[in-house]
Amino acid sequence: SRMKSNSEKNYVLDFNTTSSLFKEEVQLEPTGGNQRWSMFSSLGSNEGTVYRDILSNAFIRKQELLGKTFLIKDTLTKSKWTMTGQTKKIGIYTCYNATQEVESEVRAIQFGRSSQRASENKDVPKKTKITTLSTWFTPEIPVATGPSFYSGLPGLILEVSDDNRTILCTKVVLNPKEKIKIKAPKKGTVVNNEEFKKIQEDKIKEMREQFGRGRRQGGGNRIRIQN
């Protein structure tokens, strides 16, 4: 057996052929009720709740930010996957490996006075980081979805990994006795993806300025932001 990390969370993916809902699981079994569900263990980040319309690629992500709830409504761009030819078993399912190169912006924001006024604390210029995203999907469950935003393959994605996290399916239940209702999240401030990124950046800047105005002398902290 292995120890469970403090940063490890359990999620459930409810899905049918037209929609899916990925959310953190707080119960041992999902209640309330569609046709299938699978349980994932995620190590490395907070995914929030993600609802996807599989046919249109539209999504709604429910995300908390400093005590406020946002509903991020937008459309996923089509992913360009490369099949590697590798296969492996995840549980009883034969899975195929697909990868893609993902470009993301990484910035470091410096906190602290260090003999400077808060207004002089500048953002470090944005840097672009390329990471390889690796997924394992099974055509034995022919539904083009997966955990979080991962999708676009001819089968259910059961495992995803990159430099920062791994999301692994630990259980799949097809046609459960209790029907599962897939409902899009509704409560929250509605924004699109770009608007939410801007809100995140503004909040970080606000925190930095408040920190700089505080009594703390010298030293500092650095926060890495990856979009």
Language model region names:
Residues 1-227:
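Extended soluble regions of mature proteins
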